Swiss-Prot record:
UniProt binding sites for substrate: N132, H279, P280, G281, V282
Gene3D superfamilies: Jelly Rolls, NAD(P)-binding Rossmann-like Domain
Pfam families on file: Epimerase (PF01370), Polysacc_synt_C (PF14667)
Annotated binding of NAD(+), by residue: 7-30, 53, 103, 107
Species of the source: Pseudomonas aeruginosa (strain ATCC 29260 / BCRC 12902 / CIP 102967 / NCIMB 11965 / PA103)
Keywords: NAD, NADP, Oxidoreductase
Activity-pH dependence: Optimum pH is 9.
Record-given protein name: UDP-2-acetamido-2,6-beta-L-arabino-hexul-4-ose reductase
């Protein structure tokens, strides 16, 4: 399959082309700012689908709106018309097409050229009036406020907010690309106007607050709920703006004669992740909890866990090592300890169901002793 992508070097174009390359069996024919409009008839000569993403939204001169949007689209329509084949065509318009400003008028005129083309030769035309698109490879001070805010906040550059309560509608680049590829695959209806879902609404102030939370998480170690929805998309976008020299950061490390203890990640309501080491023969723990629980995973070395019920005196012992993927849980009301019974340093991953609170640690020293 051969696909023409106009605006292939733009924000949406780069993401789309990356996904098309992953698919395999698709040859991308790129059209960029360096390409000649006069070459369009040759470029589309044998293509099976057209993604028309090229356009102008922040020109140096107002007349460039018309040149880069409506006139370019008209030239593309003429090339398709002269080709004689009903090549399916997808166009990225804008919600600004509903507004009577120079940008909106130029995008609406482009839509009209495409609609006429579809009526004249019967080619499927898919028009997406996109709101603010955000994601990796977007340009600050050009594509969206999200890009600008991410770029600045991650570099400690002040951002400007004129109206913090102003609402903006966002769509994530991966959702845009996934929807576009469904159209190419014939999995969406042959409608003239389509939408990318989901769409997110957020105020400018809330957006900035969320991005600052991402920045501060490196110091607090507390991560937001970045696994789904808008927060996931914003976090991925935020990280895509990291300069290379900021790809890593230090976390607290506490060392003593027993070994080291490192806090890695905290959550608002699902506990925290850490790891610790212990030298041969070293025992850690010797305490119990009323409500706090933990999961231990030995990554390296040999460990002996001992447990004693503080009420009944019942005793239990578990031995495990780094060769086994085995979780050992601590149980409320059972005092417990862990001993390195090997000859090398032991490394253990640890999850606790709550973030450590120095004022209320729910940790009470109590020797485990030995079993009967």
């Amino acid at each position: 399959m051969k696909v023409l992508v106009t605006g292939a070097n733009g924000f949406v174009g780069r993401n789309l082309c990356a996904h098309l390359a992953e698919r395999g069996g698709i040859e991308v024919v790129p059209f960029t700012r360096e390409s000649s409009v006069g070459n369009l008839p040759e470029l589309i000569r044998s293509v099976d689908f057209i993604f028309h993403l090229a356009g102008v939204n922040r020109p140096e001169k107002p007349e460039e709106f018309k040149i880069g949007n409506s006139e370019l689209t008209y030239a593309l329509c003429e090339a398709v018309r002269s080709n004689g084949r009903a090549i399916p065509l997808l166009y990225t318009s804008s919600i600004q097409a509903e507004v009577d400003n120079e940008y909106g008028l130029s995008k609406r005129a482009a839509e009209e050229h495409l609609q006429v083309l579809g009526e004249d030769i019967g080619c499927p035309v898919y028009i997406f009036r996109l709101p603010n698109v955000f994601g990796k490879w977007s340009r600050p001070n050009y594509n969206s406020a999200v890009a600008t805010f991410c770029h600045n906040i991650i570099r400690d550059i002040p951002i400007q907010i004129n109206n913090s309560s102003a609402e903006i509608t966002l769509v994530y680049i991966d959702d845009v690309v996934r929807t576009f590829m469904k159209v190419m695959d014939g999995k969406l209806s042959n409608a003239v106007s389509l939408q990318v879902e989901p769409q997110y609404q957020i105020s400018v102030g809330e957006l900035a607050e969320q991005l600052y939370e991402f920045r501060n998480s490196r110091k607090s170690l507390t991560t937001a709920r970045v696994g789904s929805g808008l927060t996931r998309a914003l976090y991925s976008t935020y990280l895509s703006f990291l300069p290379e020299d900021s790809f890593s950061y230090d976390v607290p490390m506490h060392s003593d004669p027993r070994g080291t203890f490192v806090e890695m990640l905290k959550t608002a309501d699902s506990g925290q992740f850490s790891f610790f080491t212990a030298h041969p023969g070293v025992t850690r723990g010797g305490h119990y909890h009323h409500s706090k629980t933990e999961k231990f995973l030995v990554i390296k070395g040999m460990a002996r866990f001992k447990f004693r019920n503080i009420l009944t005196g019942a005793f239990y012992e578990i031995c495990t090592n780094g060769e086994k993927a085995e979780i050992v849980e601590t149980v409320p009301g059972w005092t417990h300890d862990i001993t390195n019974v090997g000859t090398d340093d032991m490394v253990v991953m640890l999850w606790a169901n709550e973030v450590f609170d120095r004022e209320n640690p729910d940790t009470y020293a109590c020797s485990v002793g030995e079993g009967a």
